[in-house]
């Protein structure tokens, strides 16, 4: 027998509590634009979707929204109902693209059933931890993902899918070792990291090393 499902708005705390209890590999996100719940006819909550700004800055253009969490108790068609409702809500608010990700090994059947399409397979990434912004491991590091989208007819082209590593995860820029310069040293693509910002600083440092100290 097919279970009839209904969509309703969810408050932030309630959606996060459901994700915390039912999501397989993610904690609740840090924020949202809106959240939705899916209920049976008896009023039992069987799933939630949390929708917010895109995590990747490549997509954060004001016209794109991301389903950052979708969690259910396994009720048939609950996921596809949430993805479809998330897009209806976003489109009515003026968004032209919605995106989400699945992990390697997930079929995406619920997304296809809701009209979404897979647009890219993304390689595994090491995670978001950085010295300037510590993040605890979440168990999702080094897992390949797939990017999915659904769009309006007038959506802008999909942006270039460059490396999604954030700036704070990149190695810190060095400062010139020649005193008293201390300018930032240009980054090198390969080889040993540069120590000096210019040839003049390199020569000055060499002379200082060779000059006998009083």
Predicted ranges, named:
Residues 119, 150-154, 201-208:
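Short Cys/His-centered divalent metal-binding micro-motifs
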Residues 19, 32-49:
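Conserved beta-hairpin
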Residues 1-30:
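Short amphipathic alpha-helix that is part of the acyltransferase structural core
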Residues 151-170:
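A broadly conserved sequence feature marking short terminus-proximal activation segments
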Residues 164-214:
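BZIP DNA-binding basic region
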Residues 4, 64, 145, 173, ...:
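A residue-level signal for beta-strand positions that form part of recognition/binding surfaces
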Residues 141-147:
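Class I (Rossmann-like) S-adenosyl-L-methionine-dependent methyltransferase catalytic domain
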Residues 6-9, 33, 40, 52-140:
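Acyl-donor binding region in acyl/amide transferases
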């Amino acid at each position: 027998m097919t279970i009839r499902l209904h969509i309703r708005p969810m408050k932030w705390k309630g959606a996060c509590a459901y994700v915390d209890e039912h999501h397989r590999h993610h904690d609740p996100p840090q924020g949202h634009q809106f959240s939705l719940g899916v209920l049976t006819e008896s009023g039992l909550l069987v799933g939630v979707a949390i929708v917010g700004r895109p995590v990747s800055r490549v997509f954060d253009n004001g016209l794109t929204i991301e389903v950052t969490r979708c969690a259910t108790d396994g009720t048939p068609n609950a996921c596809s109902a949430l993805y479809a409702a998330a897009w209806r809500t976003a489109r009515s608010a003026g968004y032209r693209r919605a995106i989400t990700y699945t992990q390697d090994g997930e079929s995406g059947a619920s997304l296809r059933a809701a009209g979404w399409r897979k647009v890219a397979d993304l390689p595994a990434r090491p995670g978001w931890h950085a010295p300037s912004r510590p993040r605890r491991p979440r168990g999702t590091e080094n897992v390949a993902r797939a990017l999915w989208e659904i769009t309006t007819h007038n959506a802008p082209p999909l942006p270039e899918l460059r490396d999604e590593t954030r700036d704070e995860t990149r190695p810190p820029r060095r400062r010139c070792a020649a005193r008293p310069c201390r300018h930032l040293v240009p980054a090198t693509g390969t080889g040993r990291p540069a120590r000096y910002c210019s040839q003049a600083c390199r020569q000055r440092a060499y002379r200082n090393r060779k000059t006998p100290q009083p």
